[in-house]
UniProtKB/Swiss-Prot annotation:
Component of the KEOPS complex that is probably involved in the transfer of the threonylcarbamoyl moiety of threonylcarbamoyl-AMP (TC-AMP) to the N6 group of A37, a step in the formation of a threonylcarbamoyl group on adenosine at position 37 (t(6)A37) in tRNAs that read codons beginning with adenine. Cgi121 stimulates Bud32 kinase activity via an activation of Bud32 autophosphorylation. Changing residue 139 to R: No effect on Bud32 binding. The gene is cgi121. This is Regulatory protein Cgi121. It comes from the Archaea. It holds the Pfam family CGI-121.
């Protein structure tokens, strides 16, 4: 599985109609690569919420059960993105279409990003923000549809 950060991507919704196996997340609310890996693991091992594995990653990463809410929270937008692909060939094809600069640092947390993540994921109080996001993902199993 390939997980890369891309700075300054331009998202054209046509890429989602190409039949390729990938997902793009808004990197501005990704709490490190660990967040993405946890979402992938949950997508592989838990009862599916979405119809496709790739959409399941988005749903799990958002900490939501509703696909439309997941897209609002962590769906692809122009700017910094996290591109998740099965293989190099798919990565190259999508990267050619969205452009930008490969930069995994967009997946790391800084003060402003932590503030945004705490707000979006409704994380109150202190504690490691990455661990709290992982908890939110795990708690999806307990939420009612």
């Amino acid at each position: 599985m390939i997980i890369r950060g891309i700075r300054g991507a331009r998202i054209n919704n046509e890429i989602f109609n190409l039949g390729l196996k990938f997902q793009i997340l808004n990197a501005d609310v990704v709490a490190t690569k660990k967040h993405v890996l946890h979402a992938i693991n949950q997508a592989k091992t838990k009862k599916p919420i979405a119809k496709s594995f790739w959409m399941e990653i988005l749903v799990r990463a958002s900490g939501q059960r509703q696909i439309h809410e997941a897209i609002k929270i962590i769906g692809a937008k122009d700017g910094n993105v996290c591109l998740i692909c099965e293989d190099e060939e798919t990565f190259r094809k999508i990267y050619e279409l969205i452009g930008g600069e490969i930069d995994d640092s967009v997946l790391e947390i800084n003060e402003d990003k932590e503030r945004l993540i705490r707000e979006i994921f409704k994380i109150r109080g202190f504690g490691n923000v990455v661990e709290r996001v992982l908890e939110k993902i795990a708690l999806i199993e307990l939420k009612k549809e």
